[in-house]
Regions:
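Thioredoxin-like thiol-disulfide oxidoreductase module
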Residues: 60-127
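Detector for methionine-enriched segments
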Residues: 1, 46-47, 78, 122
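Arg/Lys-rich, intrinsically disordered low-complexity tails that mediate electrostatic binding
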Residues: 1-27
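Local sequence-structure signature of Cys/Sec-based thiol-disulfide redox active-site neighborhoods
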Residues: 23-64
Length: 128
């Protein structure tokens, strides 16, 4: 009699003689980190090096997507984010108190960054 495996479980895992078989992870993005900025904004320019470092440090993680919305394309950019990542949510992305506005969307939940726009603080906030 042949033994069958239950592949319906999301976390299906089977160990046999030092081999592990695991379902492939989905390509769905769990975390979106973004900023709305203006080229002429002094605060945006001051934050740019830390933002680039954040992207470099966290960009290696496959489940994180970075979004940058420039002031010239603000309405279109926010519409794309709202449609793609917040489609089922009542809350929609908007500019919060000026430039830069830094935000994250984790599993459809939107939150804004209100701390110091330095690498260490932004990194802590990303994983809260």
């Amino acid at each position: 009699m042949r033994k069958t495996n239950n592949y319906k479980s999301k976390n299906y895992k089977r160990n046999t003689k030092n081999r592990t078989y695991k379902k492939k992870p989905s390509k769905h993005v769990n975390l979106v980190i973004g900023k709305i900025y203006a080229d002429w904004c002094g605060y945006c320019q001051m934050m740019q090096n830390d933002w680039d470092s954040l992207k470099r440090d966290l960009g290696k993680k496959k489940k994180i997507e970075f979004v940058e919305i420039e002031q010239k394309n603000e309405a279109d950019g926010m519409n794309v984010v709202n449609t793609k990542h917040l489609n089922k949510s009542q809350v929609k992305l908007s500019l919060q108190g000026g430039y830069p506005t830094v935000f994250k969307i984790r599993n459809g939940n939107l939150s804004y960054f209100n701390g110091n726009r330095v690498l260490e603080d932004m990194k802590k906030w990303v994983f809260e």
